[in-house]
Curated annotation (Swiss-Prot):
GO BP, sorted A to Z: photosynthesis
NCBIfam families in the cross-refs: PS_II_psbQ_bact
Gene responsible for this protein: psbQ
Lipid attachment residues per UniProt (N-palmitoyl cysteine): 24
Disulfide bonds: none
Name this protein carries in UniProt: CyanoQ
């Protein structure tokens, strides 16, 4: 009977020592590095950015169409190359780190709203409303480009 108690006591002591060692171990020496962009992400972002900038060249054509009140051409540009540009912007946003996504995502939504305002100007046959939407779109697009993180 005495022998059984010693075994129980030794088991309890070993359990307490193990618990103390595990509890006082602290954080591991190898903490993960801060999140950064992988080479694949950088390549994807640069590819999307190149396509975005290429399609953005059509802003000048949109401005002319709006000024003329050529609503069919304006809509074709917004739904064609500038619509593709919006899709590329959304794809680029998904490739950004979570901390870098909020501003570009909000500006992409704002740009979509600006295009809707141009479309509303076309529905109303109002060059003034459409031009206001165009100016807002141009400003939001420039802000979008400036909001993207520097990639090295």
């Amino acid at each position: 009977m005495l022998r059984l108690n010693r075994k129980s006591l030794i088991s309890i002591l070993l359990s307490v020592v193990a618990l103390i060692l595990v509890g006082c171990g602290g954080p591991s020496a190898t903490t993960p590095p801060p999140p950064t962009y992988s080479e694949l992400q950088i390549t994807r972002i640069q590819d999307y950015l190149r396509d975005i900038e290429k399609n953005a060249e059509r802003f000048a054509d949109l401005e002319v169409s709006v000024a003329k009140g050529d609503w069919q051409e304006a809509r074709n540009i917004m739904r064609g190359p500038l619509g593709e540009m919006l899709m590329d912007m959304r794809a680029l946003n998904r490739n950004l780190l979570a901390k870098d996504q909020p501003t570009p995502t909000a500006l992409t939504r704002a740009l979509t709203d600006d295009f809707l305002k141009i479309d509303q100007g076309a529905d109303l046959d109002s060059v003034t409303v459409a031009q206001e939407g165009f100016r807002e779109a141009e400003a939001d697009f420039k802000a979008y480009l400036n909001s993207l993180p520097e990639l090295s």
